[in-house]
Regions:
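Conserved beta-ketoacyl condensing-enzyme motif
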Residues: 22-90, 94-111, 116-134, 204-212, ...
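Active-site pocket-lining segment
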Residues: 53, 164-167, 200-203, 273-342
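N-terminal extracellular/periplasmic Venus flytrap/periplasmic-binding protein-like
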Residues: 11-12, 22-27, 31, 40, ...
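Active-site-proximal alpha-helical scaffold in enzymes
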Residues: 87-117, 170-199, 253-259, 346-367, ...
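Condensing-enzyme catalytic core mediating Claisen C-C bond formation in acyl metabolism
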Residues: 1-24, 36, 144, 149, ...
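Conserved catalytic cysteine-centered active-site region
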Residues: 24, 55-111, 142-146, 156-161, ...
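Short, well-ordered amphipathic alpha-helical segments that serve as non-catalytic structural scaffolds
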Residues: 27-42, 66-70, 95-98, 162-169, ...
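Flexible glycine-/small-residue-enriched beta->alpha junction loops
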Residues: 110-168
Length: 388
């Protein structure tokens, strides 16, 4: 198998629900990043062999195959193909993994991969009725969670909401409210410090004058977080403050074979080492990064102690802390630039976003081994290892 390198990694600012990016279609968010990536990498648009793009929704303006839409809207030649990848929250990460495997197998030299999501613009949907004249019809909000579910799924696994799965993880792995709030505070503090130090500047593509993430709250405190009511369970621990919000954004990376890299004379951001995914019970989907990370580490012979930097997507503080505990990873290396609780979690974008942040930080710090990992709705986890 051939070596695969990252030569560019960029993202939009992450917008709040109904915030500064809510007027921008998801295909336009994707196109803006694809266009910028080609320019940043200094490659000719026609050199791109494939675009793989993640999207978790696919019910609205992402228009079935947002990857192909992004190719054409970005002005790439019509000869450049595009395929959309959906592993829910890990869609952007899965797109990168598919791209890396395509290059490693010798089927491509240069691939653009990433993901986008506009949760602000996610549509409501109506199922097509079996009866031509139904007495009533249900409408589904496609922003997050279950929709138009097979009744057999309820019988087999139940249908806990994302927040309810976080409560389940908190209970099973004994992650208390105070610890969750402390983790959320750290996320905001670290993200604010990284933003103010200019650490995100090299990542961000300006969109209509927006240049920074909207959700970072530098002024939050444990006192403020402690006052928030639990959302999913009366005697629970999960609140809006220790959970990731709903967001809009896009992120992507350019991957190259070693031969293409040598011809380009570009300095790589890092090397793709390996990726893996794993399944868990849907009720504890938040613990998914544990088996996924263990699988990918075993695949390459690394140990958890070999890692110097880690990006763990913070769907909920409860699950992130449970993952840290179960992996035995040093908490100090996890999300030192903040995470999704502060920055945001636009579903299909997030896997590519955390890889982008990880690679830029490793270049800045000089660290050589990194992990990006995340939980996935309906009981999965995904992980990618990189090195410099």
């Amino acid at each position: 198998m051939r070596s695969v390198y990252f030569v560019a990694a960029r993202r939009t600012p992450i917008g709040k629900l109904r915030g500064a990016l809510s007027h921008v279609r998801p295909d336009d968010l994707a196109a803006a990043v694809v266009r910028d990536l080609v320019a940043t990498a200094g490659i000719e648009p026609g050199q791109v062999d494939e675009v793989y793009w993640g999207a978790a929704n696919q019910a609205g303006e992402d228009n079935r195959n947002v990857a192909r839409m992004a190719v054409l809207l970005a002005g790439l030649p019509e000869s450049v193909p595009g395929a959309t990848v959906n592993r829910l929250c890990a869609s952007g990460m899965e797109a990168v993994t598919v791209a890396a495997r395509t290059i490693a197998s010798g089927e491509a030299e240069i691939v653009v991969a990433g993901g986008s999501e506009s949760m602000s613009r996610a549509p409501f949907v109506l199922p097509r009725p079996d009866d031509g004249l139904p007495n009533a019809m249900s409408i589904a909000d496609t922003r997050l969670g279950w929709r138009l579910v097979n009744a057999r799924m309820r019988e087999l696994h139940g249908l806990l909401s994302m927040g309810e799965t976080a409560e389940e993880v908190a209970q099973r792995y004994k992650v208390g409210r105070e610890r969750q709030d402390e983790f959320a505070l750290r996320s905001h503090q670290n993200a604010a410090a990284a933003r103010d130090a200019g650490h995100f500047a090299g990542e961000i593509v300006e969109i209509d004058g927006v240049t920074s993430d909207e959700g970072i709250r530098a002024d939050t405190s444990l006192e403020k977080l402690a006052k928030l009511k639990t959302v999913f369970k009366a005697d629970g621990t999960v609140t809006a403050g220790n959970s990731s919000p709903l967001n809009d954004g896009a992120a992507g990376l350019v991957l190259m074979s070693e031969d293409a890299l040598k011809r380009s004379n570009l300095e790589p951001l890092g090397r793709y080492v390996a990726g893996a995914s794993a399944g868990v019970h849907p009720d504890v989907m938040g613990i998914g990064p544990v088996p996924a990370t263990q699988k990918v580490l075993d695949r390459v012979g690394w140990k958890i102690g070999d890692l110097q930097q880690a990006e763990l997507n913070e769907a909920f503080a409860a699950q992130a802390l449970a993952v840290v505990d179960q992996l035995g990873i040093d908490p100090a290396i996890v999300n030192p630039s903040g995470g999704a609780i502060a920055i945001g979690h636009p579903l299909g974008c997030s896997g590519a976003r955390i890889l982008t942040t990880l690679l830029h930080r490793m270049r800045r710090t000089g660290d050589t081994r990194g992990l990006a990992t995340m939980c996935v709705g309906v009981g999965q986890g995904s992980a990618v290892l990189v090195e410099r």
